[in-house]
Amino acid sequence: MPENIIAGIPVHFPFEPYEVQRAYMEKVIMCLRDGTNGVLESPTGTGKTLSLLCASLAWIRTRQSEQQQYMQKLQLDQQKQATGGAGAGVADLNAVMGKANNWGVPKVIYASRTHSQLSQAMRELKRTAYANMKSVVLGSRDQLCIHPDVMREQGNSNKVNMCKLKVHAKTCSFQLRVESKKDHPDFRGPSIMDIEDLVKVGQRLKMCPYFASKELVNGADITFMPYNYLLDPKARKANKIELSNTIVILDEAHNIEKICEESASVQIRSSDVAMAIEDITHIMKIFTSGDAQDTGGPEEPKDFTLDDLTLLKEMLLELEKAIDGVVVDNKAEGTTYPAAHIYELLGKANFTYGNCATIVALLDKLVQYLMVASQHSTMLRKGGSFMVLADLLNIVFANKEDVMSKVHRSFKVHVEIEDNKQSKNAANSAKPQTGWLGKGNNAASSVTKAAKIINFWCFNPGFGMEQLLNAHVRSVILTSGTLAPLKPLIAELAIPVAQHLENPHIVDRSQVYVKIIGTGPDREQLISNYKNRDNPKYISSLGQTILNVSRIVPDGLLVFFPSYPMLNQCVDAWQASGLWADISCRKPIFLEPRGKDQFTSTMEEFYQAIRDSKGACFMAVCRGKVSEGLDFADRNGRAVIITGLPFPPLKDPKVVLKRRYLETNRTKENQLLSGQEWYNLDATRAVNQAIGRVIRHRNDYGAILLCDARFQDMSQVQQLSKWIRGHLGARPQSSPFGPIVRELRQFFKHAEQTMAQPEERVVEPLLQTVCKEEQPTLACASSSQITIKREPGTGGTKFQLASELAAQAEMANTIKTWTPADYANAAGSSTLGRRAPDAMDFMSRLNANVTSIDFNSADAGQDLVKIHKRERSSPTASESSMIAKKRYKLIGNGPLKTEPSEPATTSSSFCPTPAQSQLKEAPESRADFLREVRSVIDCDQFRSFGKALLAYKTGGDGCFETLMVLLLDVLGAPQLRYLLLGMRRYLKNEHKLEFDVRLASFQAT
């Protein structure tokens, strides 16, 4: 690889670096050389991660070489002075050793927000000349553990405790093999191992990947880990992370302030305390009944005594009493107290700095005890309430008494009323069905009273960064594509910063089209503020804008909304008006789901749909998963539409207190933002992050459309990334919609003619699903292998398998209700990620796991489509290939094209004959039933059918009459009677008898 001298250090880069990459690497090396901190912004697509890794590891390698040469020189000098006497030699050796310890080569800790981002960084490292340097990634037990008993546990905390239990009892064979297998060539090989590689090697060697990875840390030049391992003191201690003389790199640091604040904040509920009291009471009953189970060997002393339990229960009862006594003046919004209130509250129950460590140790032992006991009884919880209490004590008493004045300025206690249903659910979710307590027990009353939530919130992110500096790190480098403006970030983190950088983008101006769209095609102002967001004219105009843009933008179109409620509101309105169908005629629409399982399959479907000539449209939310670090390079994202500014909820207690904290602590010296400036910046940073989904590399191109008139405000523009500001000019103004359409069309025409079109790309899997030997039916699926429509039981990702099992359960012969999700599925949405929707919520599109909604049609004037199965490509194809190739073909509502050998008419191609109908039964699945209805009636009839169902679900008895008339009209033909009969199961109970009478009368005629 080419060698470049940057800041005096030879750096091997995979290619000749661009100027922005040189500038970036120079800043990194200067930080490492001088032992200073840096805040570096470089837009997504400029090779930031590659530059960061190459620069830091080049400096490390140079230091290693220099130290090796220095030590060799000292050894030669000592040999020459060997005749000078033993005393002199010992003195020289001591001096050399002392200097060497102080001069040791630093190690790199590379931290990012998610494991997928860490995996991406490790893939970048494999491309470099530094791929042979020692590296390791730290992951959770949830990702690395291969013990079947641990993996069966639900929730990360239960897995952690089960693992600790087995290790303590020496019953985990995988962990016991670590010592004998840790030097195996497969494990110590030169290749870089990410999470999946560690799991595969662990399975092959029958060795625990979680504990084995820790064996590599001491010898590693660079260690990859998520933020919480670094910033959470408890996680740092558990993973034995040494920070002294290390280089800490925080990549994707645009949310670092919030992460620091959250790592120092904690919450406890009245129901948590009540459950902890119940758990202790039950353990005491076991002890007094003589059934106690000792987790240790027969000769080991008990980990705790009955006296320990009695004392802890008394303390918890006092804590419960103290929480009950807290006054909440404003029951709607809660009441705020100074930070000292949490210490007073805990002090009433005798929780203090002096006994905190002892109590936390006892709580850990109780969790271990319950983990053992719960293996023998399903009546027991697993100590979740003890873990909540331990977290509270660890965080509250982590701040030393000598910094209490700073704690009082930076923390607040906010007390809310715990929703009665919520507290009961919390108590009942893990509570044994027969109950543990007698009627007179004091603990039971806490849930039925006005239960409370005690929040201990940190508003000073400098606390987290101060911990790193106090651990004597060499350098801290914060970097991201969206850090601007840098000054307020540096001020909030309160760390000395010697190097800062705001890089321009790597692409030419002609590759990016940026415009503010202040009005829609109908000249209605586009402004998504609180007053206007419910305006039907605004919502319609926004939909018309997206429709017009979708006609021009090739391939992938991303649309970001300020919030989920706003996305829901627009979807509902556009579906009612027909705009949704019009947009989906141009591009199939995908919605960002909230669940993890559905998210992966949805993204894979979207990437697959991009290969179609129409492309696809993805509607997502700022600050959601799609806006954070996903790859929409090239065809996957040719344009991004920002529909509004995602301001945080103005009256949210945490937002109110954050603004108040800034106003109170702001001075000319510390340069903190005002509360309003912070509020505006929080929204703009989310916009910057969403914009960064497009333009992912040097040869990429795309459009950025800011569809909110407020983007014209200079105060808002100044907070956008520097490279975006360059495209908007000194005085940004919105342009009329007509000229924008012409310019946008010309932009893409010119780009397609002048830019090299990308080759077909294989998108990396979004969430790496680790293949476990214990689960042979779960196969890892990359996007290059994904099959959009599959038969149940044919393999695929564990998310897909879970979805199929849910779908199979849904097909049980029970009375079910209709939801709009079913209506959408009938019109072509994916079956992946489907679950039984809320029976009472007719408008729960986004709460249901609908992964994609595609009302695609060949005719822009038609709203819906017919769905047919594609024929097998070959009669001799194998069974597996037939399954893999199975798709639903989306076609228009016009005449169907037929094979030459078929009759010319098409009516019989989708309407069964009377003879056929005698043999047919209506599909059990709602979605399949709707698809069949859709395939046998025309577009207008199906639209009326859907509206009648919606009206019936939400309306009164009169709506049944309307529905009945329509059913007899559209499904009354003899060959469709099986569908008419099938409708009975979806009716309300009070209408079924009348349905039977009407149907009998209809058949008689």
Curated annotation (Swiss-Prot):
One of its GO terms (cellular component) is nucleus. ATP binds at S42, P43, T44, G45, T46, G47, K48, T49. One of its GO terms (biological process) is regulation of double-strand break repair via homologous recombination. Its EC number is 5.6.2.-. Residues 893-917 are annotated as: Disordered. It is found in: Nucleus. Belongs to the helicase family. RAD3/XPD subfamily. This is Regulator of telomere elongation helicase 1 homolog. The lineage of its organism: Eukaryota, Metazoa, Ecdysozoa, Arthropoda, Hexapoda.
